[in-house]
Amino acid sequence: MNKKVVLSVLSTTLVASVAASAFAAPKDGIYIGGNIKKYYSTDVLFEMTPQAKATYASELNAMASDFNNVVFVDYKGKGASIEELFTKGSKVALGEPLKKEDFADLYKVVNKDGSSTATEDARAKVDPTPTGDLNVESVSANNLKEVVVTFDKAVDADTAGDKAYYTFTANKLAVDKVTVSGKTVVLTLAAKAENQASYELNVDGIKGLVKTTKEVKFFDNTTPTVAAVAAIGPKQVKVTFSEPLSAKPSFSVNNGAIAVVADNFVEGTKEVILTLGAQPTASTNTVTVEGGADYASYKVEKVTKDFTVVADTTPPTVSVKKASAKQVVLEFSEDVQNVQDKNVVFYHTTKGHEGYKGTILGVDGKEVTISFVNPLPEGQFKIFVDYVVDNGTQISDLWGNKLPEQVITGTFAADTTPPTVTKVEAKTNTEIHVTFSETVNGADNKANFTLKGVTGNVIPLTKAEVVDAAKNIYKVVTTEPLNGGSYYLTVKGIEDASKNKLVEYTATVAVADTVPPNVKDLDPATPGTDAQLISPTKVKIAFTEPMDKASIENKNNYMFNGFNLDSKVTLTATDSNTAVVVDFTNVVGFNGFKNGDAISVGRVLDTAGNPKTEMQTKVNLPNSVSAPLFDKAEVTGKNTVKLYFKELIINAKADDFAVDNGEGYKAVNSISNDVVENKSVITLTTGNDLPTTAAGVKVKTVGEVDAKNQYGVAVALTDVPADDKIGPNWLKAETVDTNNNGKIDQFKLTFSEALYVASVQDSDFRIEGYTIAGVETKGEVVTIKVTELDIDDSDATPTVAVIGSVEDLKRNASGPFEPQKAIDGVSAPDKEAPVVTGVEAGKTYNTAVTPDSADKDIKTVVLKKDGKELAGYALKTPISENGSYELVVTDNAGNTTTVKFKVDIPAEDKKAPEIKTVTDDKVAVADAPKWEAPKATATDDVDGDISDKIAVTYSSEDAGSKVTDLASAQTHLGTAGNTVKVTYNVTDKAGNPATAVSATFTAI
């Protein structure tokens, strides 16, 4: 069992135990038995010192071979050994009662600093093992579509009602529906069984029941009968049969006196509702049934049954039958109608709130299943039956008795147990089946699975898909067939319906070897298949898998340039029989390989005896010694790079290598050389930190290199890029107040690189003193939304903990992390009202106005005209209609500015003013020097008397005259017979010009 996985399971599972326990014992936490005998409470596990955590981890490692002696207890008092959690799955294991023998006699109670000052007697606090555990008394089948399972006592309705817990050996039959009543369970099959055939029924997963297998023989030699007939409405009659029918019978009411206008028969039903054309008036009536057939092809014998019609005046009732996080099953007291009418609405928690509105998934008899987008609150919850229109269609029984609007209560215990992998099995050399403990999401996404070989190489997958949803079985499919041997499948990113995230799980998968071996190309950069020249007289030929030693060392399986190998040539299997060294050293006259030399490899065998497919494979031989075969480089830690070679490397030293962290090459501090499958994995430790994205990280060899392969050839690397195999680092947490009201409503967590969104869940975080309402991930930032407190917490810097793991975009995981104090990112509460410009309180404007504000946190703007709100008004919108206005501007902090003003813009003036006519006149020559043109008068409908605005011009049509103004006009009139024309013009304020008026004056 993978210790790392176990430690992660323990850490993550305990998150569910934070809630206050309602039980006296056993206390929640981890009980380590064996020779250790220590009890770690949930609170202690979350707040231990680093030294105490290290001790805890070492103790778990010490118990890795005996996880039956490590017991986990949740806050509800449910518990199981870690071994049981892995082998049975958490849903089954935690459903079984704890027993005294699960615990040691006394445990030392561990404090946060790792010390122990008290003891805990968990064994004494467990109820004695109950007698009379649940048993299956009998299994029978009286027809070909139903199986009756009888228990020795009433069963747990939730687990007994799950069809996934009933399976038939060899999957010959499948259960479609389960009906639970006391200690009897009726299974309805998806397809009929064969008559007189026997099957094995497995019952496993029901609370209190050990897995039970019973033989059930299907033998149907009886005709179906009419079990009951009842009036369920004024025009509805229900006919119940003794078993499911495959074909519909005929029905007649009162010998045909009342027509049957419709029925709801479907194949496989036991109940048929007849809709009549008229309401029976007699107290006693008859239904005649004939024909139809059961699944053994026996017909219903003709029979006439009486039924009485008694008016029902009692309205139906409804209650909660079953509830999960986002789904509720309601059960009515009788058959009802109109449940799915658009006038019928269901809510939970708050009536009328769209976020709590339900969607009907289906109606089955008297039951309706409703789903919700937002989950139910834990504990007691409310379901509201509401009607959109009071006088609209309502739920009623078939007699028309209406169900009134009402509130139904129920109890929901939130699922806090993460799903587990219960089985991993290779079905073929391209398919691996994975079984989960419960219904999960994400198991059909191949990105949530990683398959590796024993050397750590990643095996490409083509897809992941469901095999059997009812049994939670999925499969992953490989791109190429797998060679025989062991592989490692890692599963992560999976969650159940309650958003509980699967702890990363790795399983060893054994695959039978049916794949033929082949020769491996050791130089993919050149055409053809190439060997490795390890010395002037030796070549290494590699294979795709471990080979039969005798086969690859047999000279008869090789030819050199078309001829049999010289008798002096030796063949030696190497690299765990995945390669062979062909040595020409002792061949007389051999001076080395030339261009074009090749060795042909025949049908050598792998360890399973599979021969190579091709009769001969030509392998090209280099004419110069090859550098040691290198595979890849990976950044695996803050200061570590791993180099993977395809062969054994010896004498490697730190000064053989340099690492570039993106800022230039630097020397390596130290190295380690691990050998896996006779191939070296060299770990380089650097002094400079490496980016978690591996961006710009490169490796090269420097100077005189001591690192060589077993044939004495030095390693040669030039600017080799390193892949990203390191998870993200958590940099900081910062408080946020989005509405600037002095209360924290978000925490912004920044990581060293962009995160894979699906890897981040609410349950990955804890914040001291705050309730998490949701998370959002964008790039490297995780925004945690929290419920605002009722106090001013703008200066708070609570402790933030990342208790789960998060992944980068390449699915590299990190976490949990050490808790951090949040950085104070919240300013003091905003108490300053918005500043409104463009209008002033109390002013009246005779032109259009445009209110505005430079504040950036405006939340609402309300404008009223003459007391009535103008919907949709926004700042910067001109106001040009006359009226009395009230403008209310509110910022995010709730500060408000109110401005009252008026707009009174005069009506547009389009009428020209009028000038009163001035009459022509005569002027005596003697009076000319003092003459002035008579005054004219002008009026305007808007501006009034505008006589003072009249403009006067002077002119003369006399020959040679130069009259332009009053003075020249006076001079001109000094001669008898001369004339002067005076013209009067005026324009009102709106720019409308009057019609000009003229008068002519003649000198006499």
Curated annotation (Swiss-Prot):
Signal peptide: 1-24
Keyword match Signal: yes
Domain of life per record: Bacteria
Sorted UniProt keywords: Cell wall, S-layer, Secreted, Signal
Coarse class of the protein's main subcellular location: secreted
Compartment list: Secreted, Cell wall, S-layer
Annotated Gene Ontology cellular component terms: extracellular region; S-layer
Primary role: The outer wall protein binds to the middle cell wall protein.
Subunit composition and interactions: The outer cell wall layer is composed of subunits of the outer cell wall protein. These proteins form a hexagonal array with a lattice constant of 14.5 nm in the outer cell wall layers.
The protein's name in its UniProt record: Outer cell wall protein
Provenance organism: Brevibacillus brevis (strain 47 / JCM 6285 / NBRC 100599)
